[in-house]
Amino acid sequence: MVTIRLARGGAKKRPFYQVVVTDSRNARDGRFIERVGFFNPIASGQAEALRLDLDRIEHWVGLGATVSDRVHALIKDAKKAA
């Protein structure tokens, strides 16, 4: 099953997440099909905290991809801000 979820990057104690489309059987930070955005939970000042390609996310959801709870909340925030 294809899912849209967060893949962790960044350094120790400084997380940075890529929003990726992947097979649910793959490891959290493993192989993915497409990168559709990023989330920086510790962004400050002028740094961009969230960027999502909503068109591509809607495309994948239309094809039957499931969305993780956290990514669903991020999509909701992005739509509210836009």
UniProtKB/Swiss-Prot annotation:
<dbReference type="GO" id="GO:0005737">
    <property type="term" value="C:cytoplasm"/>
</dbReference>
<dbReference type="InterPro" id="IPR020592">
    <property type="entry name" value="Ribosomal_bS16_CS"/>
</dbReference>
<dbReference type="GO" id="GO:0003735">
    <property type="term" value="F:structural constituent of ribosome"/>
</dbReference>
<dbReference type="InterPro" id="IPR000307">
    <property type="entry name" value="Ribosomal_bS16"/>
</dbReference>
<keyword id="KW-0687">Ribonucleoprotein</keyword>
<dbReference type="Pfam" id="PF00886">
    <property type="entry name" value="Ribosomal_S16"/>
</dbReference>
<comment type="similarity">
    <text>Belongs to the bacterial ribosomal protein bS16 family.</text>
</comment>
<dbReference type="GO" id="GO:0006412">
    <property type="term" value="P:translation"/>
</dbReference>
<keyword id="KW-0689">Ribosomal protein</keyword>
<protein>
    <recommendedName>
        <fullName>Small ribosomal subunit protein bS16</fullName>
    </recommendedName>
</protein>
<dbReference type="GO" id="GO:0015935">
    <property type="term" value="C:small ribosomal subunit"/>
</dbReference>
<dbReference type="InterPro" id="IPR023803">
    <property type="entry name" value="Ribosomal_bS16_dom_sf"/>
</dbReference>
